[in-house]
A protein has these predicted regions:
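Cofactor-pocket helix-loop regions in the catalytic cores of large enzyme subunits
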Residues: 1-193, 212-393, 397, 429, ...
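Extracellular/periplasmic loop regions
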Residues: 195-198
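Surface-exposed loop and adjacent secondary-structure segments within mature catalytic domains
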Residues: 201-205
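Long, compositionally biased stretches
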Residues: 374-463, 468-518, 536-540
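Long, low-complexity intrinsically disordered regions
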Residues: 521-540
Length: 540
C-alpha cells in the first residue's frame, strides 16, 4: 500500500466492488482475478457480456485472457516500462485529462520528463509487447468514460512493487480515472481480512488507522487510552527483516499468529535456520502447520466459524461476523488468548468481548469512528472512512480532493528483476496460487473435494521448452535455483511463455519458496516472489 499512500495519501482500494457493474473498461494488471477473487472476476465477466472492454496485462495466458479485448503479454517484471509507455502515448497524443491534471495533481512536468524516454519501440524491446497493442491499450484506457484499474500481488511481489503501484496511480491520475464511481485504482487484497489487519496497525510503523508511531501526539493519545507511559516511537521490523535479525541472533523470540512462514516466505531453508536460532517461538494457529511444528509453545486458536467480530474486506467494508459453532478442545479466540498472555505478563487487559474492542477502535481510530456495533448489526457493513455515526460510509475515495490534497505524480524508471536468467539458470520462475487452494494449504488441503481437484504440485512449462528438454506431461522435473531445488511434475501448456515456468506455494511436498529470491522492496518490505532464475531438468 506504500505506493498508493505516497501518490494519493491513502493506501486502500479507491472504489467499490459493485461499481464494476457500470464500468466501461477494466485494466487488469498483476491479478488472476477469476482464480484468486472469483466473485469479483464474475462481476468483470458479467460487465464484459454487457459491453465493457477488458485490457489484461499478464505474462501468463490466464482465464481472463479469453475475455480480453487486448492482452498485453509483457515480460515478467517490466510493468513500469509498460505503463510508462502507455502514458507517453497518452501525453504525446494529447488525450490525457488536462482539466483534472491541472486542478487535482502536481508534478506533471517530472512525469513527462521520465515517460518521454519510453517510446513505443523502446517499450516493445523491454516488454515484448507489440507497438499496436500498446497504442491500442493506451488510447482505450485514456478515452473511455469510466475505467477501473485492478491489481494484486502480481505487481506488488517484486523488488520494484512500490514503483509498480505508483506507476499505476500515475496512469489513473493522468487520465482522470480517480475520484468517480466505476473508476479508480483498486488493489485486491490477498486474504479476507488483510485490509482490516493493516487498518488496525498490524504493520511496523503505524497504530490503528495508519496513525504513525513516530508522531508524538499520536503516541500520547494511545498512552492515555491504554494507561501506559512512553510508547516506543521507533519503527519496527518487517517480516523479512525479522527473519534476517533472527538468523543473526539480534531477534531472540517471535510470536506468530495465523502465519506459516516455513512455506510462505522466500528462501525457506533460511527461514528454518532463523526460526531454529530463536530462544523462544510461540505459534498461535488453528492447525499444526509446518511453522507450528518448530514452536516451543503452540496456542490453539479458533477458526472463523467459531468466533465473533468484524472483518474489513478489500473494498474497505467492515462487516460483522457471528459465531456459528463452539470451538473444539481448548481452542480460544485470538483476542482472548492475547488478553490472557498480556495478563500473565503483568498488563491486564479489560476487554470482555469483541464489542469492547470495537468500542475502543471507534474512540481511537478516526476513519472507524462511526462504524459502531449497533450500526453493523443492522445492515451489510460500512466502508471507511466513516467519521461519525451519522455518516453513511464512503463507497469511493478522493471525490473532490485526494486524502493528501493534490495527487502526486511520482514517476519511476524501469528496473529489471533482481535475478535475470543466464546461461546456467536459463528460466524465470514465477509463483502464485490456483483456484482450488489457498496460500500454504493449511486449511484447503484438509478439504477432500479440493484435494481431489488439485492433489499435487505442478510446474507449468511452455511446449517449445518442454520439447527442447525432452519433457512430457506428468514427467517429474527438477527445478534448481541458487538457493535450493525441488522435484515436481510438469504440465506442458502455452499458458506460460517460453523461458518462463510457473508453480504454486500450496504444497509442502514441493516447497517452491526454497527457490525464491529473498530480495525485497525497500519501501514495502514485500519479497520478490514473482521472478527468480532457475534451471529445469527432466528427472531420469
Amino acid at each position: 500500500m506504500a505506493g498508493l499512500a505516497a501518490t494519493f495519501g491513502s493506501g486502500a482500494m479507491t472504489n467499490s466492488i459493485v461499481e464494476a457493474e457500470k464500468a466501461d473498461l477494466f485494466f487488469i494488471i498483476g491479478t488472476n482475478t477469476t482464480s484468486q477473487h472469483p466473485l469479483i472476476g464474475s462481476r468483470i465477466i458479467n460487465a464484459k457480456e454487457r459491453g465493457a472492454k477488458i485490457i489484461l496485462a499478464d505474462p501468463r495466458k490466464i482465464q481472463l485472457a479469453d475475455y480480453a479485448d487486448i492482452h498485453l503479454r509483457h515480460n515478467i517484471g517490466t510493468d513500469v516500462a509498460l505503463l510508462n509507455g502507455m502514458m507517453n502515448i497518452i501525453i504525446e497524443e494529447g488525450i490525457y485529462d488536462r482539466q483534472y491534471v491541472e486542478e487535482r495533481t502536481e508534478n506533471l512536468d517530472q512525469l513527462k520528463a521520465v515517460v518521454s524516454r519510453y517510446t513505443t519501440r523502446v517499450v516493445e524491446q523491454i516488454t515484448g509487447v507489440p507497438v499496436s497493442d500498446l497504442e491500442g491499450a493506451a488510447r482505450a484506457y485514456a478515452t473511455t468514460g469510466k475505467a477501473m484499474l485492478f491489481y494484486a500481488m502480481g505487481i506488488t511481489q517484486h523488488a520494484t512493487g512500490t514503483d509498480n503501484v505508483k506507476t499505476c496511480a500515475n496512469l489513473a491520475m493522468l487520465t482522470g480515472h480517480v475520484g468517480r464511481p466505476s473508476t479508480g485504482v483498486n488493489p485486491l487484497r490477498g486474504q479476507n481480512n488483510v485490509q482490516g489487519a493493516c487498518d488496525m496497525g498490524a504493520l511496523p510503523n503505524v497504530f490503528s488507522g495508519y496513525q504513525q508511531v513516530a508522531n508524538e501526539e499520536v503516541r500520547k493519545k494511545f498512552e492515555r487510552a491504554w494507561g501506559v507511559e512512553k510508547l516506543d516511537g521507533k519503527v519496527g521490523l518487517t517480516i523479512t527483516k525479522m527473519m534476517a535479525a533472527a538468523q543473526k541472533g539480534d531477534l531472540r523470540s517471535l510470536y506468530i499468529m495465523g502465519e506459516n512462514p516455513m512455506l510462505s516466505d522466500p528462501d525457506s531453508s533460511h527461514i528454518e535456520l532463523a526460526l531454529s536460532n530463536l530462544d523462544f517461538l510461540v505459534v498461535q494457529d488453528i492447525f499444526m502447520s509446518e511453522t507450528a511444528l518448530l514452536a516451543d509453545v503452540v496456542l490453539p486458536a479458533t477458526s472463523f466459524a467459531e468466533t465473533a467480530g468484524t472483518y474489513t474486506n478489500t473494498e474497505r467494508r467492515v462487516q460483522m461476523a457471528h459465531k456459528a459453532i463452539d470451538p473444539p478442545g481448548s481452542a480460544r479466540d485470538d483476542w482472548d488468548i492475547i488478553c490472557e498472555v498480556s495478563r500473565r505478563s503483568g498488563y491486564p487487559m479489560s476487554y470482555r468481548s469483541t464489542a469492547d474492542i470495537l468500542k475502543e477502535i471507534n474512540e481511537l481510530t478516526p476513519s472507524y469512528a462511526g462504524i459502531t456495533r449497533e450500526r453493523l448489526t443492522k445492515g451489510f457493513g460500512l466502508q471507511w472512512p466513516c467519521p461519525n455515526e451519522e455518516h453513511p460510509g464512503t463507497p469511493y475515495l478522493h471525490k473532490d480532493k485526494f486524502t493528501k490534497g493534490l495527487g502526486s505524480f511520482l514517476p519511476c524508471d524501469f528496473k529489471p528483476v533482481s535475478e535475470v536468467p543466464d546461461e546456467e539458470y536459463g528460466f524465470l520462475l514465477t509463483t502464485g496460487r490456483i483456484y482450488y487452494h489457498y496460500h500454504t494449504g493449511t486449511m484447503t488441503r484438509r478439504i477432500s473435494i479440493l484435494e481431489r481437484e488439485a492433489p499435487e504440485p505442478l510446474v507449468e512449462i511452455n511446449p517449445d521448452d518442454a520439447k527442447r528438454l525432452g519433457i512430457r506431461n506428468n514427467d517429474e522435473v527438477e527445478l534448481i535455483s541458487r538457493r535450493g531445488s525441488i522435484k515436481v511434475k510438469a504440465e506442458v501448456t502455452d499458458r506460460v511463455p517460453e523461458r518462463v515456468v510457473f508453480s504454486t506455494f500450496h504444497f509442502h511436498e514441493a516447497p517452491v519458496n526454497l527457490l525464491t529470491n529473498p530480495v525485497f522492496d525497500p519501501d514495502s518490505g514485500i519479497p520478490e516472489y514473482k521472478g527468480c532464475a532457475v534451471k529445469v531438468r527432466r528427472c531420469a
